[in-house]
């Protein structure tokens, strides 16, 4: 496929996504790739992200190129509330001077049924339009770390070792018998079963993970992995996250996650 054909295919995929979810009664939204920011309203995490963003000042006003749709929509709807409970978008994101096209959905005040229906529709779109299918699924939950590791041990060094799955380092800092070490020693397909030995059965994170695992299996997905190593990209990501990896295009990953800041939601996104 030459450059012209790739460009046409990309634009057709964007248009098809909007048509597909418009037909499914999602509200379509179109926001400028240039965000107008107020320094007084930016928090510590916003400022940390400026390292990967392109931004500039003009007449005492700060502007930045969009680097995250969920973050942009959350910021906008916090100031201008919407009655929409589910929205669909397409457009550019720019991170570290690299531009990419992303398509995605946001469910606001989400119910489990609505989020799972959104995921089903998203995967159906990928099957029909992109001619691809889910190869395996990764589940995780951002409350697991607090359930498995005392706050006093959540130092930058230890968190980095967990994220890198550095077992030799964790042996030294935590001990070979620590729950995190014991879980990481297992195959990721078995870790959800092992997790049950280290946190109470009624822990909200474990309950939610088991609900999702059962539902995914009813949808025909058998290759399900647990990730206890991921750190939330923003503090408002406080719940379950999911990654759907595909069979044909291994570089594409459908990602989703629950968040609760000034707005509660569950987002799903795919970079084309």
Model features per residue range: what roles?
Residues 1-272:
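TRNA-recognition modules of translation machinery and tRNA-sensing kinases, especially anticodon-binding
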């Amino acid at each position: 496929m030459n450059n012209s054909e790739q460009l046409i295919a990309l634009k057709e995929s964007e248009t098809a996504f909007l048509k597909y979810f418009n037909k499914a009664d999602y509200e379509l939204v179109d926001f400028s790739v240039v965000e107008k920011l107020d320094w007084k309203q930016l928090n510590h995490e916003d400022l940390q992200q400026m390292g990967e963003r392109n931004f500039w000042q003009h007449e005492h006003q700060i502007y930045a190129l969009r680097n995250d749709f969920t973050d942009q929509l959350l910021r906008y709807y916090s100031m201008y509330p919407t009655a929409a409970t589910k929205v669909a978008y397409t457009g550019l994101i720019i991170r570290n001077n690299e531009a990419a096209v992303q398509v995605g959905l946001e469910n606001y005040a989400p119910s489990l049924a609505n989020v799972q229906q959104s995921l089903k529709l998203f995967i159906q779109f990928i099957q029909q339009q992109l001619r691809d299918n889910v190869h395996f699924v990764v589940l995780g939950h951002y409350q697991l770390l607090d359930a498995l590791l005392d706050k006093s041990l959540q130092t930058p060094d230890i968190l980095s070792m967990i994220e890198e799955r550095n077992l030799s380092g964790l042996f030294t800092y935590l001990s070979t018998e620590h729950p995190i070490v014991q879980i990481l020693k297992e195959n990721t397909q078995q870790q959800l079963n092992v997790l049950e030995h280290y946190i109470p059965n009624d822990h909200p994170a474990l309950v939610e993970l088991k609900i999702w695992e059962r539902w995914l299996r009813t949808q025909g997905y058998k290759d399900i992995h647990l990730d206890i190593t991921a750190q939330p990209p923003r503090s408002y990501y406080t719940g379950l996250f999911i990654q759907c990896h595909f069979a044909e295009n291994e570089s594409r990953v459908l990602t989703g996650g629950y968040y609760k800041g000034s707005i509660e939601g569950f987002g799903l996104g795919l970079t084309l």
